[in-house]
Amino acid sequence: MKFFSYILVYRRFLFVVFTVLVLLPLPIVLHTKEAECAYTLFVVATFWLTEALPLSVTALLPSLMLPMFGIMPSKKVASAYFKDFHLLLIGVICLATSIEKWNLHKRIALKMVMMVGVNPAWLTLGFMSSTAFLSMWLSNTSTAAMVMPIAEAVVQQIINAEAEVEATQMTYFNGSTNHGLEIDESVNGHEINERKEKTKPVPGYNNDTGKISSKVELEKNSGMRTKYRTKKGHVTRKLTCLCIAYSSTIGGLTTITGTSTNLIFAEYFNTRYPDCRCLNFGSWFTFSFPAALIILLLSWIWLQWLFLGFNFKEMFKCGKTKTVQQKACAEVIKQEYQKLGPIRYQEIVTLVLFIIMALLWFSRDPGFVPGWSALFSEYPGFATDSTVALLIGLLFFLIPAKTLTKTTPTGEIVAFDYSPLITWKEFQSFMPWDIAILVGGGFALADGCEESGLSKWIGNKLSPLGSLPAWLIILISSLMVTSLTEVASNPATITLFLPILSPLAEAIHVNPLYILIPSTLCTSFAFLLPVANPPNAIVFSYGHLKVIDMVKAGLGVNIVGVAVVMLGICTWIVPMFDLYTYPSWAPAMSNETMP
């Protein structure tokens, strides 16, 4: 028993050594550059999937192994660890830092929920819409962590209002007050059931913005242990948790900067196919927004039906008097919004810079008309989305966070201390350096596959798949990444599959975008398990869900997601990128139109 206990304690160390030794015959026996690169790929992939080593540490292995095998010089490998992607990420994180520092994200979320009304079904849609919108610009993780406490307060107020109605009715019929059902009517989060807000870390994750921290409302007493007054209250909490987790992931699909998988794909694609000018912020948004919108609406309908039933008459009734629960819900949202006070100077500046950044991204090269990048026609392709992100990001360090002068009691106007909207220390606390290293490792691995000839070898071996219909190849690859991403991190999954799917597309004479776009989108469909992605873990940590709840709900959302992506890649996305024709910017192949 003591021996097994030692194995259990040192299992990670033993697994790392075991993996390295078991795979070692591959380069020793074959002794080709392809085999040596395959050994590196298998070792890195195994450690990424099992997380035997931290993801970022594993991502550094190509910088060690590729030079040792003579595949690439160390200087060339090192250059893969900092690319245009990293500059784009820095600019986006500057924006995210200012948004969260000045609470603009909370104001946007509450305002959007106030706009949709207090009907339970529409309220849920409001939370999903606001969460998805924020997730377009912030990380999925921080969006879920920010919206959940707001949703918790709203749902708690609904449950309290229901209990109040029950107590009032019982008092009316019995002629006496039922003290057991008295509740605290305050909507202040510190007064409801003597709850207090704590920060609860979710272990084992490093994602879009680094460490995960979710604001979890925990009971001070044993109230949460006795769980819920009614089954409906429990179901409502489940529904709210799942809506926020799933919508934060769905919203990230919409923009290149919305989630790390999109960024990894964009950088890989632009590096492998530098002559392609068709993929940018605007073109990505144009094809992904309809897909994300459809997935969001269908997921909302699915979750409503699964947990509450779908009563159209109740949902779309007009001119009816609001119930006590709906009034209470509206009140708590209103009071939470009022706590923010009037919009401040810092929020206005952040919002203006945010809008300018989005407009510059869209107008750089919209496709249907010349963009502002045409002003630099002498240097085509020099200005990218990272140029815009860095320009706006720099302004956050320059623009003062408050007016630079003040009036003294004597009426004299004097200058006082200058401080920018964000500081470098604040930026560093938000910057996901682990993701930056992880992405760099993926690029280094992809470069190694190209230099060694492994990518070409894989493509040749997969070329028999060309006999299958293109839609079937896309479906198979989409289902593969959707399944794998449930047990592996999204960035690791997409980094692993891109160097495999690109040569496959080239080998079977298919437009690479035809396979890579759906595979990239499906990599984000990690809806089944709490450990599948950080937003799932955040909402699961509130204690309202069981694993089986997430599996049942997530299975439906997964099916919806894959179906919508397949619909999009066969309809509106086709003419945008001429997907049925093998492009001139791909490696030399005879231009053929797919049957």
UniProtKB/Swiss-Prot annotation:
It catalyses: sulfate(out) + 3 Na(+)(out) = sulfate(in) + 3 Na(+)(in); selenate(out) + 3 Na(+)(out) = selenate(in) + 3 Na(+)(in); thiosulfate(out) + 3 Na(+)(out) = thiosulfate(in) + 3 Na(+)(in). It comes from Homo sapiens. One of its GO terms (molecular function) is sodium:sulfate symporter activity. InterPro entries: Na/sul_symport_CS, SLC13A/DASS. It comes from the Eukaryota. Belongs to the SLC13A/DASS transporter (TC 2.A.47) family. NADC subfamily. GO terms for biological process: sodium ion transport; sulfate transmembrane transport. This is Solute carrier family 13 member 1. It is found in: Apical cell membrane. Glycans are attached at residues 174, 207, 591. The chain crosses the membrane at residues 13-33, 41-61, 77-97, 108-128, 131-151, 239-259, 290-310, 348-368, 381-401, 464-484, 491-511, 512-532, 554-574. The keyword Ligase does not apply. Its main location: membrane. GO terms for cellular component: apical plasma membrane; plasma membrane. Sodium:sulfate symporter that mediates sulfate reabsorption in the kidney and small intestine. Can also mediate the transport of selenate and thiosulfate. Pfam families: Na_sulph_symp. The gene is SLC13A1. Keywords: Cell membrane, Glycoprotein, Ion transport, Membrane, Sodium, Sodium transport, Sulfate transport, Symport, Transmembrane, Transmembrane helix, Transport. Inhibited by thiosulfate, selenate, molybdate, tungstate, citrate and succinate. PANTHER family: SOLUTE CARRIER FAMILY 13 MEMBER (PTHR10283), SOLUTE CARRIER FAMILY 13 MEMBER 1 (PTHR10283:SF65). It is a multi-pass membrane protein. Highly expressed in kidney; not detectable in the other tissues tested.
